[in-house]
């Protein structure tokens, strides 16, 4: 996908295998915002990390234990959370599913 392209057709874009039962697909983005789909197999881990981007995560399907700055929440389909810049966060998948992550500004480190 090219930056500022208006339509992202999911079926035309491959997944990036991150290992450990996690794969990612960068969807629509420009310099200000990026949408990323992340698929988790049962018991897969979203490694604890931090970054300077603002992040909002939406649970499209599945159930996750999601930790932000030392507080752990159980999130399921339809739930969302806000991750402030530089907050330490990560997750554990307790029912296979998909997270939709929205970042501002875009994550240049996710581009090929």
Feature annotation, model-predicted:
Residues 85-109:
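Ligand-binding loop in jelly-roll beta-barrel domains
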Residues 1-32, 112:
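A short, N-terminal "cap"/entry segment at the start of jelly-roll beta-barrel domains
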Residues 70-85:
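Short acidic-glycine-tyrosine-enriched beta hairpin
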Residues 39-41, 50-66:
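Short, conserved beta-strand element in jelly-roll/cupin
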Residues 60-61, 76-77, 95:
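A cytosolic small-molecule/anion-sensing beta-strand core signal
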Residues 67-71, 94:
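Short strand-coil-strand connectors
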Residues 19, 34-50:
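Conserved short histidine dyad/triad with adjacent acidic residue
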Residues 45-46, 65, 81, 85-90:
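Histidine-centered metal-chelating micro-motifs
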